[in-house]
């Protein structure tokens, strides 16, 4: 290590700008906890800035625009499905395309969920416009605060504090440490569900709850790898981490033939061959192992790693490493020679 501050000095303002972009463009309620969303784009909105969506019923479909129209359509419920480019963009922005937490579920799964007493509205996403001070549309936020995004923002603040300290900016370092602590407190107070013992995204309500949370955890959409992001980033309390690891090691949840898939077996949207709703992605698997190790579960993490290498088809042979793997059979899925993996 050269201890050369030049590179740190060059990168620091760029990383500060990136940090601030999220708070300016994806923090609709201004509480410091960003959401995922969509930029202003012809694929997402009309020229006048109204969000696009397509209503599908039977063999008919109609493209409409505007958040007010969207709210009316959702309230009436007279549709088979909705196609919303901004919803897709938000999931892509997270890196977890079509994940259950963003409201994605197959029709047959949703029908079963409703038949078992659930509500279709549990899987309906809502949006808000984000605008600059002069009223210019910047883009859209899902009206839910994502626990993985909050956890990464926690890490961002820690790293910025370290860089500010190196560069002799003590006040800025202090500010970023405070922001990190505020995020950790929020994650553990608002995003952990004591009943199911797991972390979830939070649905943003019209008014904050009495405890300062924007809303309640979205437990209905099931458990996913976002739930161990507070462990990977070090934002979790030890007690909450203990509970999450117990879920991760449960054969009825994530501890499958190939463990730590992108949806728990109990998730209503789970499918062993569904993109980001069951398949095992190596990056999310690794995040889980590192989070376990960080909170004192190294031996358990090593056992899961051993299971992965033994059961993921072709992984220890001469073939290419796959994009993802079937959690129940270990079958190769997705693209070969995938860079993340």
Annotate each predicted stretch with a short phrase.
Residues 27-28, 37-39, 169, 192, ...:
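An acidic- and aromatic-residue-enriched active-site/binding cleft used to recognize and process polar
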Residues 33-145, 185-280, 313-341:
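Extended glycan-interaction surfaces of carbohydrate-active proteins
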Residues 19-22, 164, 184-187:
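A structural signal for well-ordered alpha-helices, especially hydrophobic packing surfaces
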Residues 146-184, 279-316:
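Extended amphipathic alpha-helical segments enriched in small hydrophobics
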Residues 11-38:
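Extracytoplasmic mature domains of secreted/periplasmic and thylakoid-lumen proteins
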Residues 2-13, 30-31, 164-181, 234-249, ...:
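Structural helix-adjacent loops and short alpha-helical linkers that scaffold large soluble proteins
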Residues 8-11, 15, 22, 304, ...:
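Aromatic sugar-binding interfaces of carbohydrate-active proteins
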Residues 11, 149, 226-227:
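Residues that flank catalytic or metal-binding motifs in active/ligand-binding sites
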């Amino acid at each position: 290590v050269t201890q050369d501050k030049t590179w740190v000095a060059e990168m620091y303002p760029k990383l500060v700008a990136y940090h601030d972009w999220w708070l300016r463009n994806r923090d609709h309620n201004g509480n410091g906890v960003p959401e995922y969303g969509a930029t202003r784009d012809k694929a997402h909105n009309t020229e006048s800035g109204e969000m696009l969506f397509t209503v599908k019923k039977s063999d008919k479909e109609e493209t409409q625009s505007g958040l007010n129209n969207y709210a009316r359509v959702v309230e009436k419920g007279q549709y088979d499905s909705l196609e919303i480019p901004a919803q897709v963009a938000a999931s892509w922005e997270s890196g977890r395309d079509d994940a259950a937490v963003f409201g994605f579920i197959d029709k047959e799964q949703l029908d079963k969920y409703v038949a078992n007493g659930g509500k279709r509205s549990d899987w309906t996403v809502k949006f808000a416009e984000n605008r600059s001070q002069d009223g210019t549309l910047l883009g859209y936020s899902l009206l839910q605060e994502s626990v993985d995004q909050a956890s990464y923002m926690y890490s961002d603040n820690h790293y910025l504090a370290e860089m500010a300290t190196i560069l002799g900016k003590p006040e800025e370092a202090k500010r970023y440490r405070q922001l990190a602590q505020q995020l950790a407190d929020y994650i553990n107070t608002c995003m952990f569900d004591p009943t199911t013992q797991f972390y979830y995204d939070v649905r943003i309500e019209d008014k904050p709850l009495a405890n300062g949370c924007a809303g309640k955890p979205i437990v209905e959409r099931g458990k996913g790898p976002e739930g161990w992001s507070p462990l990977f980033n070090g934002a979790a309390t030890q007690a909450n981490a203990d509970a999450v690891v117990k879920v991760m090691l449960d054969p009825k949840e994530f501890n499958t033939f190939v463990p730590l898939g992108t949806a728990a077996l109990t998730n209503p949207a789970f499918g062993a061959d569904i993109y980001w709703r069951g398949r095992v992605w190596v990056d999310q698997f690794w995040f889980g192992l590192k989070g376990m190790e960080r909170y004192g579960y190294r031996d358990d993490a090593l056992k899961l790693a051993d299971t992965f290498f033994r059961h993921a088809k072709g992984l220890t042979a001469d073939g290419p490493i796959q994009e993802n793997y079937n959690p129940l059979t270990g079958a190769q899925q997705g693209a070969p020679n995938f860079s993340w993996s």
